[in-house]
Amino acid sequence: GPFDPSHRYETSWLLSPGALFAYRATLSTYAFIATFVNLGWNGTHGGTAGQSFSYFTNLTFWGLSFYFAVAAAHTGTYWLTGRPLLARWPRWCQELHAIFYSTITVFPFIVTIVFWAILFPGYFETTFAAWYNTTAHALNSVFALVEIVLPRTQMRPWWHIAPLIFLLACYLGLAYVTRATEGFYVYSFLDVRANGSGVVAGYCFAIAIGCFIIFALVDGIIWARVKITEDVMGRKGKRS
């Protein structure tokens, strides 16, 4: 059957398509501005702009930036023409968009939890560092949570966990490639010499298990949202 016959990815139970488009476009614009300002600041203040893509935080924030841009395009085309761009794509692209949605509703929470629980140094040295870290390690999860609650998306299939774990494994490989080529550990808890292989493996398994738990919790929120907004409140989505 059709991938998304009632256009759940492009509509909201609360906002009109035009308002949802504006919201998503605004978030994408802010996220891209924050990303490029961070690159510019680090590049001109003796920072690590050249190592930006080695950090899971930054990769996840790039993902959020592009997701909201693509989601805005889908919602905008639905708003203007009645047929979203997503509906015109081949099925495999539609499935990739669904997986994309799963990544941006799981990975930001992992980033936030790991940073504040393990990596946060206790203070920020500059106002800029406070702003960007708050954006990338706190607002990222706010953006993700709103994208869970606001649209009409349904629960994701459980097989989406497989590409999520695969992407985490790919990042783990990237972290050690960075160690081999750049000479530093992106995250201190990945340092085998300092922590021991058992501790590092424990961190990796804990993050993988956390991915499962967050995925399940997010699906629970989506299930509750669908039940409350559609079955109880009778809001089947604003289509115009």
Predicted regions and their residues:
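Membrane-lumen (extracellular) interface motif
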Residues: 35-59, 116-135, 148-162, 177-198
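Transmembrane alpha-helix/helix-exit interface in multi-pass inner-membrane proteins
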Residues: 72, 102-124, 172
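Membrane-interface transmembrane-helix boundary segments in multi-pass integral membrane proteins
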Residues: 15, 19, 182-218
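Non-transmembrane, juxtamembrane loop and terminal tail segments
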Residues: 1-10, 231-240
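Transmembrane alpha-helices of multi-pass eukaryotic membrane proteins
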Residues: 16-31, 50-67, 71, 92-108, ...
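Transmembrane-helix exit/juxtamembrane "anchor" motif
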Residues: 72-80, 213-235
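Aromatic-anchored segments of alpha-helical transmembrane domains
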Residues: 32-36, 110-117, 167-177
